[in-house]
């Protein structure tokens, strides 16, 4: 089968925004104008095509990034047909991992901003992720029909808050309820969309007289941005010559691809205006797979390799999302970087060194699917029934193995205990959690050895709510959630010598007798955690009982004398004791050892250790004082801050127990404009008052 669309006409783009900037509605309109969906889905009535999980339609927020293929030939059919693969990404801070993984497989992005709200906090986080992966982007200022809409204010915020070199491609005609269309600054024509056919057709008209001067000024700004692409154009421009439309467009494209400028378009997706011109901008300015650098990877011999976007190169692809589908089981979304694959072919998962057979391949249109026989470089598709693939794995040709750059996923930061409501739910819950953990690398499940409870960990409180919600809906498992947990530890600070433990029951018949004398001493936290030294001389305790002494102490370490938490970082020296020919046994020595350990532990200055998190907060400069003040109240140690003019990064170490509810508090202190990440750093001694409260709570 030959390629239907040349790879130069592919656009793999993400649509990214803050919650409520109208991203899903914008995506819906793209699907409508590109002829994929015949009825426009509205988020307002829970019918949007891209939001396909029930919860998304209820909450009106997008959680999973669905990938959809659409075709576009331009507003006035001025291009050959282009294939646009759209990845819809969530805008909520708890789902940053979803945004991160879609940025990894995109070539370009459309950043959607609300004309009223402007550049909001999550937009700053998403912007930083796009910078990290060097994704070329354009902006679409949506909701121009809303009260308080102000296009140029948003352009200004792109410059001041994000440090973007924002260059408007259009100016809006009117605003709020008087918003009627846009002026194309390259053509210097007004575009008016026909409301009768939901904006499918439009007319070019003269620029309104009252906008002429403004449009001239902004066109000058645009042409100058284009001229900076090369010395020849700059000379032509400075010499007073006009640049042709073709020259302007190709120069702007060059600068967008180099991440030097952000072109800004505007409209109202809800009112069917502007999305059509934004699609033209996607085709004209965002990269094809051939415009971006070859993807890097590691060859089997550990040297660096790469794959170019070409059908001729060996097959390589990256699995970027696993989704569970009610009808076909696992869907593995993957992006093809090079080569061709047919359904039925076998490939290598080079990360796990396992072979996988591509049974069926489907191209997704939101939640509808079309079976296809082959995929080629540049395609994004989903495979059904791959056995052992997780997010971030490379699938490649068996004869040309390579491991493509992996995605990095943050460590989970919050844990809660879950228990099934009924016995019947028990087994189903294990299955459901395993399935969900496979889909989402930032979600983990483990069993707490101390309490036997099932603990789930994730990126935030909303993240875990949604996991529990999905268990209920998709797997019909009802579960109760506990309070967020902190795992403390216990240890000692001073050495104690010659503490004895004696277990003796000798009242006629076979008795029990064990007697040990031990020293207890602290170990370095970087060390083994526990050591046992046997220094018995002259057989005062026979060799066969020594392991029982060690075992008796190790059993005590699982649940410490202070508050029942695991004991770490201590050593035991066994150096004296006594035994009885008849009455001594392994059990008696085990019990004697545990008595000696408890007695020694209480004398060795026992302390409670708490987990300390490494916390990084990124905040606009005006909130630094509030953020640091709040961190100090949480017993934080602030290690330093780095600033540029848009954002200050604060590094701190904070006890985990003080971080519950932090996301909500940080949001309210900074009007939602700051973001934070945290990961486990170390254990440190808890202050006396904190330790006393924890110990007290455990006794209840």
Curated annotation (Swiss-Prot):
The record's annotation in SMART domains points to: EFG_C (SM00838), EFG_IV (SM00889)
Which family does the similarity line name? Belongs to the TRAFAC class translation factor GTPase superfamily. Classic translation factor GTPase family. EF-G/EF-2 subfamily.
Q: Which species does this protein come from?
A: Haemophilus influenzae (strain 86-028NP)
> Which GO molecular function annotations are given, in alphabetical order?
GTP binding; GTPase activity; guanosine tetraphosphate binding; translation elongation factor activity
Q: Which GO terms describe its biological process?
A: ribosome disassembly
User: What protein name does the entry list?
Assistant: Elongation factor G
Keywords of the record, alphabetical order, are: Cytoplasm, Elongation factor, GTP-binding, Nucleotide-binding, Protein biosynthesis
Q: Which Gene3D superfamilies does the entry link to?
A: 3.30.230.10, 3.30.70.240, Elongation Factor G (Translational Gtpase), domain 3 (3.30.70.870), P-loop containing nucleotide triphosphate hydrolases (3.40.50.300), Translation factors (2.40.30.10)
Q: Name one GO cellular component term.
A: cytoplasm
| Biological role | Catalyzes the GTP-dependent ribosomal translocation step during translation elongation. During this step, the ribosome changes from the pre-translocational (PRE) to the post-translocational (POST) state as the newly formed A-site-bound peptidyl-tRNA and P-site-bound deacylated tRNA move to the P and E sites, respectively. Catalyzes the coordinated movement of the two tRNA molecules, the mRNA and conformational changes in the ribosome.
């Amino acid at each position: 089968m030959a390629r239907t669309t040349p790879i130069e006409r592919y656009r793999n783009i993400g649509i990214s925004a803050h919650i409520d900037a109208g991203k899903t509605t914008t995506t819906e309109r793209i699907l409508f104008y590109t002829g994929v969906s015949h009825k426009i889905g509205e988020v307002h009535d829970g019918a949007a095509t891209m939001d396909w999980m029930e919860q998304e339609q209820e909450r009106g927020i997008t959680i999973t990034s669905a990938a959809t293929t659409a075709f576009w030939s331009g507003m006035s059919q001025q291009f050959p047909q282009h294939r646009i693969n759209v990845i819809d990404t969530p805008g909520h801070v708890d789902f940053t991992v979803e945004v991160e993984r879609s940025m990894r497989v995109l070539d370009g992005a459309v950043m959607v901003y609300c004309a009223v709200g402007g550049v909001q906090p999550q937009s700053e986080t998403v912007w930083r992720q796009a910078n990290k992966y060097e994704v070329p982007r354009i902006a679409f200022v949506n909701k121009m029909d809303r009260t308080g809409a102000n296009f140029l204010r948003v352009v200004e915020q792109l410059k001041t808050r994000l440090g973007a070199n924002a260059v408007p491609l259009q100016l809006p005609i009117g605003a709020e309820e008087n918003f009627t269309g846009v002026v194309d600054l390259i053509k210097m024509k007004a575009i008016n969309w026909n409301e009768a056919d939901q904006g499918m057709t439009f007319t070019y008209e003269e620029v309104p007289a009252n906008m002429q001067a403004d449009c001239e000024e902004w066109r000058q700004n645009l042409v100058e941005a284009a001229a900076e692409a090369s010395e020849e154009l700059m000379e032509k421009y400075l010499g007073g010559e006009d640049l042709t439309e073709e020259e302007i467009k190709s120069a702007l494209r060059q600068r967008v691809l180099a991440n030097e400028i952000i072109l800004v378009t505007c409209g109202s997706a809800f009112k069917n205006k502007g999305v059509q011109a934004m699609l033209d901008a996607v085709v004209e300015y965002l990269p094809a797979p051939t415009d971006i650098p070859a993807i890097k990877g590691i060859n089997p011999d550990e040297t660096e390799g790469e794959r170019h976007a070409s059908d001729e190169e060996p097959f390589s692809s990256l699995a970027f999302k696993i989704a569970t589908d009610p009808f076909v089981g696992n869907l593995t979304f993957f992006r093809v970087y090079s080569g061709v694959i047919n359904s039925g072919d076998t490939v290598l998962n080079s990360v796990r060194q396992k072979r996988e057979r591509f049974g069926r391949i489907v191209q997704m249109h939101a939640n509808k699917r079309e079976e296809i026989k082959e995929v080629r470089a540049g395609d994004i598709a989903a495979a059904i029934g791959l056995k052992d693939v997780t997010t971030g794995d490379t699938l490649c040709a068996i004869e040309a193995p390579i491991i493509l750059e992996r995605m990095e996923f943050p460590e989970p930061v919050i844990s809660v205990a879950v228990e099934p409501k009924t016995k019947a739910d028990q087994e189903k819950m294990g299955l459901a959690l395993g399935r969900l953990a496979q889909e989402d690398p930032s979600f983990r499940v483990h069993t707490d050895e101390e309490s036997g409870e099932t603990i789930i960990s994730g990126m935030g409180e909303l993240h875990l709510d949604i996991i529990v919600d999905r268990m209920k809906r998709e797997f019909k498992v009802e579960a109760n959630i506990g309070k967020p947990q902190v795992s403390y530890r216990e240890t000692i600070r001073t050495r104690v010598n010659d503490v004895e433990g004696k277990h003796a029951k000798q009242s006629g018949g076979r008795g029990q007798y064990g007697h040990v004398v031990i020293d207890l001493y602290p170990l370095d936290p970087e060390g083994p955690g526990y050591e046992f030294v046997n220094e018995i001389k002259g057989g005062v305790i026979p060799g066969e009982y020594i392991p029982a002494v060690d075992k008796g102490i190790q059993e005590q370490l699982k649940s410490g004398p202070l508050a029942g938490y695991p004991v770490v970082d201590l050593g035991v020296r066994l150096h004296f004791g006594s035994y009885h020919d008849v009455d001594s046994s392994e059990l008696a020595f085990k019990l004697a050892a545990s008595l000696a350990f408890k007695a020694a532990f209480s004398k060795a200055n026992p302390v409670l250790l708490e987990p300390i998190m490494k916390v990084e907060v990124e905040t606009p400069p005006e909130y630094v004082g509030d953020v640091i003040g709040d961190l100090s109240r949480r017993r934080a140690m602030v290690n330093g801050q780095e600033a540029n003019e848009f954002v200050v990064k604060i590094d701190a170490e904070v006890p985990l127990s003080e971080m519950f509810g932090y996301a909500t508090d940080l949001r309210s202190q900074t009007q939602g404009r700051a973001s934070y990440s945290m990961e486990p750093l170390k254990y440190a001694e808890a202050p006396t008052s904190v330790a006393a409260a924890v110990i007290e709570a455990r006794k209840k």
